[in-house]
Swiss-Prot record:
This is Mitochondrial import receptor subunit TOM20 homolog. One of its GO terms (cellular component) is mitochondrial outer membrane translocase complex. The keyword Zinc does not apply. The chain crosses the membrane at residues 4-26. One of its GO terms (biological process) is protein import into mitochondrial matrix. It is found in: Mitochondrion outer membrane. Residues 27-147 are cytoplasmic. It holds the Pfam family MAS20. Its main location: mitochondrion. SUPFAM superfamilies: Mitochondrial import receptor subunit Tom20. Central component of the receptor complex responsible for the recognition and translocation of cytosolically synthesized mitochondrial preproteins. Together with tom22 functions as the transit peptide receptor at the surface of the mitochondrion outer membrane and facilitates the movement of preproteins into the tom40 translocation pore. InterPro entries: MAS20, MAS20_rcpt_metazoan, Tom20_dom_sf. Forms part of the preprotein translocase complex of the outer mitochondrial membrane (TOM complex). Interacts with tom22.
Amino acid sequence: MVAVGKTSAIAAGVCGALLLGYCIYFDRKRRSDPNFKNRLREKRRKQKIAKERAGQSRLPDLKDAEAVQKFFLEEIQLGEELLAQGDFEKGVDHLTNAIAICGQPQQLLQVLQQTLPPPVFQMLLTKLPTISQRIGNAQNLSEDDVE
């Protein structure tokens, strides 16, 4: 019975030593790589860009009425779902996208003012100018492509 405990202790010690050796070997290999820092910076930059893009919905072709309508309905639905789950930031972002693309934003704002709690509606009003500007910039870029 003592032999089993001693054997398992030796096995655990050997496994620990192998793990430590493995870590030291790959750490040394990583540090000696001349491109490591460049690859790490590039990876972090890509992650940052991906994170920024995840927060922004992909805008539809503003000349395609069907795509705009589909985008509008998806944004309203996503916004409502996220607000129901308690994620007010993302929910308001999606509702703001829908308002910015909407053909009659004043009527939609009136409906939202009646249905949303006042703090959430205020959050929506503060985000609306930045989202509208982004969509306006996207529209200007698409017009520049045509010229």
